[in-house]
């Protein structure tokens, strides 16, 4: 018989340097740190095997299928410059290994058991190339950037948001009041914090009602369309959908979901509901740093961002480059492009390992949030451009005169930066001067400038390119 029992080296089956990748393959770039004594070919082949058809020993049932058709293949290995014993292993997966339209299934295979594999000291998924054939099985973002602008009637500038603080402990009525003050002052959006769900001090239904009242009042007073990201995240999918339905009945424009803690299955269901019912969907990435912050193990955020674009969301938090949370500039701009653009060229200097064509899947607006204030406005406008949401939580609510003046200060600073940019001025070089000029005719901005003139979050990023 052709069956030969026993353990054989992975590389004999799964390391295929001569393989030419197909347009329909899902391609993955792994950063592999093998255990001492394990050659890189064996480590790369082990990753390909354990994340596709392989197991630790030859099995009789291998003969009942065509491994050549279904196996993952490690087709290229390169050492990581400046690191000893660390390699980038490229793996190609045949499309048939994955259920259509399921980010959950894709991740279960590609980043499943293999990450606990003993022959590896550490493993990190750096990037994925999603083939067009697979992308076409996903709905993607409920609406996308252009439709959102049309719904909100806001063009030619970044949008402004604010997370309501203190994040936990306010009653629904006081929470709604804070929302109203911010929106009336000139912000486009306010936001539930990611951990505001339905707690004893503020149940979700009360919050939804008071926030809806606040945004309609602010809308009437300012003549601008306003939104509040109502967090629909809940303990069960059914409860989450119930909250989304209630938000739709209130007629609000946007709801929110924590997509990593809530899970991709729940997120995809919610995104489908949002498209069917005209709701925008704001996505918060709570838990991402558990997965993506370590340089040699886990999964890079650009992979989580691609997965979100497939699963569906209209906004996603994407770091600030200048605030209090982790984020290297080139890397951040790399995945910001992956979220917004239709076609992204391979560019290793920005951490992009593969050329990605999104075949007209709608884009996602990146949200800059975390420790930013008016002095950061020129840098943020320059780094993120118009298609972004800039969120100032403490940077609005921490204003010495209150929420509405805090909102005014941010709006004045933003309009000044956009005007200066449109006149051809260099925001990077002249940013401080632009803010100072604007503060001369805005007492609210002048007060904000005074409060935050010394605040900096100067720490080196942990996850850098080199």
UniProtKB/Swiss-Prot annotation:
Q: Which reaction does it catalyse?
A: 2 (2R)-3-phosphoglycerate + 2 H(+) = D-ribulose 1,5-bisphosphate + CO2 + H2O; D-ribulose 1,5-bisphosphate + O2 = 2-phosphoglycolate + (2R)-3-phosphoglycerate + 2 H(+)
Q: Does the keyword Acyltransferase apply?
A: no
GO molecular function (one): ribulose-bisphosphate carboxylase activity
- Major localisation: plastid
InterPro entries per UniProt: RuBisCO, RuBisCo_large_chain_AS, RuBisCO_lsu_C, RuBisCO_lsu_C_sf, RuBisCO_lsu_fd_N, RuBisCO_lsu_N_sf, RuBisCO_lsuI
Which Gene Ontology cellular-component terms appear in the entry? Answer: chloroplast
Q: How is the cofactor bound?
A: Binds 1 Mg(2+) ion per subunit.
Q: Does Transmembrane helix show up as a keyword for this record?
A: no
List positions binding Mg(2+).
Answer: 191, 193-194
**Coiled-coil residue spans:** none
Post-translation: what modifications?
Answer: The disulfide bond which can form in the large chain dimeric partners within the hexadecamer appears to be associated with oxidative stress and protein turnover.
Subcellular location per the Swiss-Prot or TrEMBL entry: Plastid, Chloroplast
Spell out which residues are annotated as carrying N6,N6,N6-trimethyllysine: 4
GO biological process per UniProt: photorespiration; reductive pentose-phosphate cycle
Give the family from UniProt. Answer: Belongs to the RuBisCO large chain family. Type I subfamily.
Further remarks about this protein from its record: The basic functional RuBisCO is composed of a large chain homodimer in a 'head-to-tail' conformation. In form I RuBisCO this homodimer is arranged in a barrel-like tetramer with the small subunits forming a tetrameric 'cap' on each end of the 'barrel'.
Primary role: RuBisCO catalyzes two reactions: the carboxylation of D-ribulose 1,5-bisphosphate, the primary event in carbon dioxide fixation, as well as the oxidative fragmentation of the pentose substrate in the photorespiration process. Both reactions occur simultaneously and in competition at the same active site.
Q: Subunit arrangement?
A: Heterohexadecamer of 8 large chains and 8 small chains; disulfide-linked. The disulfide link is formed within the large subunit homodimers.
NCBIfam families, from UniProt? PRK04208.1
- The name of this protein is Ribulose bisphosphate carboxylase large chain
Q: Which gene encodes it?
A: rbcL
């Amino acid at each position: 018989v052709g069956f030969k029992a026993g353990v054989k080296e992975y590389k004999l089956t799964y390391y295929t340097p001569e393989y030419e990748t197909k347009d329909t393959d899902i391609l993955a770039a792994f950063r592999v740190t093998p255990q001492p004594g394990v050659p890189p070919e064996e480590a790369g082949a082990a990753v390909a095997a354990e994340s596709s058809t392989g197991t630790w020993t030859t099995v009789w049932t291998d003969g009942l299928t065509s491994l050549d058709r279904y196996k993952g293949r490690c087709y290229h290995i390169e050492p990581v410059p400046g690191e000893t014993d660390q390699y980038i292993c490229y793996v190609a997966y045949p499309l048939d290994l994955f259920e259509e339209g399921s980010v959950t299934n894709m991740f279960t295979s590609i980043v499943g058991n293999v990450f606990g594999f003993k022959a590896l000291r550490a493993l990190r998924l750096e990037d994925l190339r999603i083939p067009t054939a697979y992308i076409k099985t996903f709905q993607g973002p409920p609406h996308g950037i252009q439709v959102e602008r049309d719904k909100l009637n806001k063009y030619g500038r970044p949008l402004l948001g604010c997370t309501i603080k203190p994040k936990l402990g306010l009653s629904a009525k006081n929470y709604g009041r804070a929302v109203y003050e911010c929106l009336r002052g000139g912000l486009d959006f306010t936001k539930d914090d990611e951990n505001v769900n339905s707690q004893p001090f503020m149940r979700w239904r009360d919050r939804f009602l008071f926030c809806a009242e606040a945004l309609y009042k602010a809308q009437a007073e300012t003549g601008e369309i306003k939104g509040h990201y109502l967090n629909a995240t809940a303990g069960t999918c059914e409860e989450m959908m119930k909250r989304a339905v209630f938000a739709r009945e209130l007629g609000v424009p946007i709801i929110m979901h924590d997509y990593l803690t809530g899970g991709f299955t729940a997120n995809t269901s919610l995104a489908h509901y949002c498209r069917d019912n005209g709701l925008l969907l704001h996505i918060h990435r709570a838990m991402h740093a558990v997965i993506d912050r370590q340089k040699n193990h886990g999964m890079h955020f650009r992979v989580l961002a691609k997965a979100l674009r497939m699963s569906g969301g209209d906004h996603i938090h994407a770091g600030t480059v200048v605030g209090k949370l982790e984020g290297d500039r080139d890397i951040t701009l790399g995945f910001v492009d992956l979220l917004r653009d239709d076609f992204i060229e391979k560019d290793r200097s920005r951490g992009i390992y593969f050329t990605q064509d999104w075949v007209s899947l709608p884009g996602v607006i990146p949200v800059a949030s975390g420790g930013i204030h008016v002095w950061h406005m020129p840098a943020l406008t320059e780094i993120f451009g118009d298609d972004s949401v800039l969120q100032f939580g403490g940077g609005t609510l921490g204003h010495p005169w209150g929420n509405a003046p805090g909102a005014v200060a941010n709006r004045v600073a933003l309009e000044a930066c956009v005007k200066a940019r449109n006149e051809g001025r260099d925001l990077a070089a002249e940013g401080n001067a632009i803010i100072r000029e604007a503060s001369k005719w805005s007492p609210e901005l002048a007060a904000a400038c005074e409060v935050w003139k010394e605040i900096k979050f100067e720490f080196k990023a942990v996850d850098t390119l080199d």
